[in-house]
């Protein structure tokens, strides 16, 4: 079985930049990602990453980016599978726009949707140079979500988060809605406050601890979206939520570090443990309430 998404409204905020090629060397993008980042190059302590434990799952949060690079645009021809994936992304993004617009309206606020930029290999954006190895991420500087669609194949091949294309659909929706969760944090003013605290932190342990809370809140917001979308569309099939939980488990810091280096360094966590990611996603999914996602003041994560 697979989630039913045919009646989701398609967003017009998907920008296909896969034909864009970028010159120059690599420069780490400073964005908020779901947890498959492999950073190449020098990373300062202020970014909250311990270079000795760089793993898929590391996180960068900083202002500014690399200088703009010259780009060229070439047409991209899609096969049927790629075209369907693009349609799915537009559908999920469209529904996040609708659900968060409703929730913001109920709070007396206006929701300003982000753009989602599709790319292949590498792209230059508001947070610097992005490469596909970084995984999906949100850039606070230009308020765009960046996604290389090859990441969805990685969910199957590298992380074992799901077994096939159909089984992966809700896991993929979780990935997208997590990144939108970061944009929601930006809209609510949470990100600027946390970034200021990170910049004032005296060491990387404090920076990472704040980052974990930000990432877990985005997981919770992904759950809130799923709850509201289910109420609206009744789109979930048996096993869909399990797939999202399996994905959250597959990209927990503890599991990634254990697989990469054979041991776990809790002080270096930037996204939370597998159990924490599952717990906070379910907090949002079971309640459907933003108030259930206060990871910043929670005494226990």
Where is each model-derived feature located?
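A Zn2+-metalloprotease active-site environment signal
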Residues: 8-21, 25, 29, 33-270, ...
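Short, Lys/Arg-enriched N-terminal segments with co-localized hydrophobic residues
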Residues: 1-2
């Amino acid at each position: 079985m697979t989630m039913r998404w045919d009646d989701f409204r398609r967003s017009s905020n998907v920008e296909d930049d896969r034909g864009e090629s970028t010159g120059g060397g690599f420069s780490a993008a400073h964005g908020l990602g779901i947890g498959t980042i492999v950073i190449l190059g020098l990373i300062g302590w202020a970014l909250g990453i311990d270079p000795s434990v760089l793993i898929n799952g590391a996180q960068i949060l900083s202002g500014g980016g690399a200088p703009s690079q010259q780009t060229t645009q070439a047409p991209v021809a899609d096969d049927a599978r790629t075209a369907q994936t693009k349609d799915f992304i537009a559908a999920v993004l469209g529904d996040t726009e609708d659900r968060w617009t409703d929730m913001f309206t109920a709070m007396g606020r206006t929701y300003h949707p982000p753009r989602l930029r599709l790319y292949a290999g590498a792209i230059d954006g508001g947070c610097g140079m992005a490469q596909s190895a970084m995984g999906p991420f949100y850039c606070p500087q230009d308020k765009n979500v960046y996604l290389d669609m090859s990441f969805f194949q990685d969910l199957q091949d590298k992380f074992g988060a799901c077994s096939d294309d159909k089984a992966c659909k809700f896991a993929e929706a979780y990935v997208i809605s997590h990144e939108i969760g970061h944009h929601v944090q930006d809209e609510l003013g949470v990100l600027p406050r946390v970034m200021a605290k990170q910049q004032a932190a005296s060491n990387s342990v404090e920076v990472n601890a704040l980052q974990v809370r930000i990432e877990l809140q985005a997981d919770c917001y992904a759950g809130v979206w799923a709850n509201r979308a289910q109420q609206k569309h009744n789109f979930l099939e048996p096993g869909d939520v399990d797939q999202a939980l399996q994905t959250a488990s597959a990209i927990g810091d503890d599991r990634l570090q254990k697989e990469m280096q054979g041991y776990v360094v809790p002080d270096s966590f930037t996204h939370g443990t597998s159990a924490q990611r599952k717990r906070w996603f379910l907090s949002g999914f079971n309640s459907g309430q933003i108030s259930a996602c206060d990871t910043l003041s929670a005494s226990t994560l």
